[in-house]
Regions:
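Conserved HxN/HPN-centered segment at the entrance to the catalytic loop
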Residues: 3-18
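Catalytic-loop of the protein kinase fold
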Residues: 59-82, 89-91
Length: 175
C-alpha cells in the first residue's frame, strides 16, 4: 500500500476530552494525499468517500479548536494519509512542513486551490477552507479511478457538495 520509504510529517492530532476537542502536535509516518493519488490512482470507492468524510471531520475539529480560525491552505499537499489510512492535516506552523507553504507560492497551485482575495466575502471567515475542500474533492474525483465506478446519484451528490463549497452566491454557500 505504501511506498517503501514513507516519510515522517508533523501533523495536528485532535484529542477528545469530554465533548471538546484539543489540538496536539505529533510526528506520524505516512504520505501526502497528492503522492498517494499519483502513485496509485485506482482504489475502492468507499476509500475515497472515507477520505472526503475524514477531511471534513478534521477541518471541523480544527475550526472548533481554534475558535473558527481558518486552516488556510486545504489542498492535496497539506493532507496526509497515515499507514492505517487515516486522513490528517499537516501542521503548517512546523518548520519541517514549510514545503507546503512553498508549494502554495507556485502559480498553478494558487490558481487552482486558493480563492483570489478579491472574491472572498466577509460573510464567513472559513470560506477559504470550504473553497480548498471543494477543490480537493474535485481533485480526488478527477485523479482517481474508483472501483466500482460512481453511480449517477453519487456523482450528483459530490457535484452539489463541490458546487456549494466553490459558490460565490451567499445563499448557496456552506456556513
Amino acid at each position: 500500500m505504501f511506498k517503501s520509504a514513507a516519510e515522517n510529517y508533523e501533523i495536528i492530532r485532535f484529542m477528545e476530552h469530554g465533548n471538546r476537542w484539543h489540538p496536539a502536535m505529533d510526528c506520524v509516518q505516512g504520505e501526502l494525499l497528492i503522492d498517494r493519488v499519483r502513485r496509485c490512482p485506482e482504489g475502492e470507492k468507499e476509500e475515497g468517500f472515507g477520505w472526503i468524510r475524514q477531511l471534513a471531520q478534521q477541518l471541523e475539529r480544527f475550526h472548533r479548536c481554534r475558535s473558527g480560525q481558518c486552516y488556510r491552505y486545504v489542498n492535496p499537499y497539506s493532507v496526509m494519509i497515515t499507514r492505517d489510512g487515516q486522513i490528517m492535516l499537516l501542521d503548517l506552523d512546523a518548520q519541517s512542513n514549510a514545503f507546503v507553504l512553498k508549494n502554495m507560492q507556485k502559480r498553478a497551485m494558487r490558481n487552482h486551490f486558493v480563492k483570489p482575495l478579491l472574491h472572498i466575502r466577509d460573510h464567513t471567515r472559513l470560506f477559504a477552507d470550504f473553497y480548498g475542500f471543494g477543490k480537493t474533492v474535485q481533485f480526488l474525483m478527477a485523479s482517481t479511478i474508483p472501483d466500482p465506478p460512481l453511480t449517477r446519484c453519487e456523482s450528483r451528490k459530490l457535484y452539489r457538495i463541490t458546487e456549494k463549497c466553490l459558490s460565490e452566491d451567499p445563499k448557496r454557500v456552506y456556513q
